[in-house]
Amino acid sequence: MFIALTNDDGIQAPGLRAMYKALKEAGHTVQVVAPVTEQSAVGHAVTIALPLRVKIFAENGFQGMGVYGTPTDCVKLGLNALLDKKPDIVVSGINAGANVGPDILYSGTVSAATEAAHMGYPSLAVSYDNFKPDDIAAHARFAVEIMESMPWQSLPPRCVLNLNLPDVPMQQCKGLTLCPQTRAVWKDWYDHRTDPRGNSYWWLNGIIPPETVAEGTDRDMLTRGYATLTPLRFDFTDRETLARLQQNMDRQRQGSEDL
């Protein structure tokens, strides 16, 4: 298959390089369009007031196009202008750090995959549950196997598959599980610090409290040592509330008509 590969950690990130190598070793054709610089947690940001510039990277058996922009910029520019042809699948990752529950709202990794899905391409986001991945070659090979096993043609339009890999050696991984995303949210705090010049600044920290994580959700299963796969569809409509509001509005209208 022809795979378009991107990420949000940057084109030189170990996770992307591991995924590139695993895809190539599996016999796939791969073209990379990824940010030149770190773009973690930029969400679905798109550059609209600045030009996008491209830098070619070719080193140690790797070749790719680096974009001075966001992950979504990379996908939009790649699919519209840079790639040799339309890819069979767009893969985003491997991200350093899990993307579970509320993470998907912030994640450049998931947003890149989402943009591809919105443009009509099968897409897979891949993340690893450690912010400082070491040797993840086996995890990358596992991700490729999952990609190859998916029934892409039968998935609904604009569906994104979100794969998270546990922070354990792959031989200790308990397997792949399908699960929903957690509804638990981050508890944030900011450290107030002073730089070497005496200037004040703030540094974000946070945690998803374990006691708030429902059993069987992505954060729970990932912590237990499973790889998790969650299909995502970015329709934010709260249909239950929509129905209740509609009923309330209908009652109000009926009451007005009875006067």
UniProtKB/Swiss-Prot annotation:
Under the heading NCBIfam families, the entry gives: PRK00346.1-4 (NF001490), surE (TIGR00087)
Q: What does this protein do?
A: Nucleotidase that shows phosphatase activity on nucleoside 5'-monophosphates.
User: What does the record give as cofactor?
Assistant: a divalent metal cation
Q: What class of enzyme is it?
A: hydrolase
UniProt KW Metal-binding keyword: yes
Where does this protein hold a divalent metal cation? D8, D9, S40, N95
Task: Tell me, in one coarse class, where this protein mainly resides.
Answer: cytoplasm
| HAMAP family cross-referenced by the UniProt entry | SurE
Per its UniProt entry, which superkingdom is the organism in? Bacteria
Q: How is the cofactor bound?
A: Binds 1 divalent metal cation per subunit.
Q: Which GO terms describe its molecular function?
A: 5'-nucleotidase activity; metal ion binding; nucleotide binding
Source species: Oleidesulfovibrio alaskensis (strain ATCC BAA-1058 / DSM 17464 / G20)
Question: Which GO cellular component terms, listed alphabetically, does the Swiss-Prot or TrEMBL entry include?
Answer: cytoplasm
Q: Where in the cell is it found?
A: Cytoplasm
| Enzyme Commission number | 3.1.3.5
Designated name of the protein: 5'-nucleotidase SurE
The UniProt keyword set, sorted, is: Cytoplasm, Hydrolase, Metal-binding, Nucleotide-binding
UniProt cross-references to InterPro entries, sorted A to Z: SurE (IPR030048), SurE-like_Pase/nucleotidase (IPR002828), SurE-like_sf (IPR036523)
The entry assigns this protein to a family as follows:
Belongs to the SurE nucleotidase family.
Per the record, what are the reactions this protein catalyses?
a ribonucleoside 5'-phosphate + H2O = a ribonucleoside + phosphate
Matching Pfam families: SurE
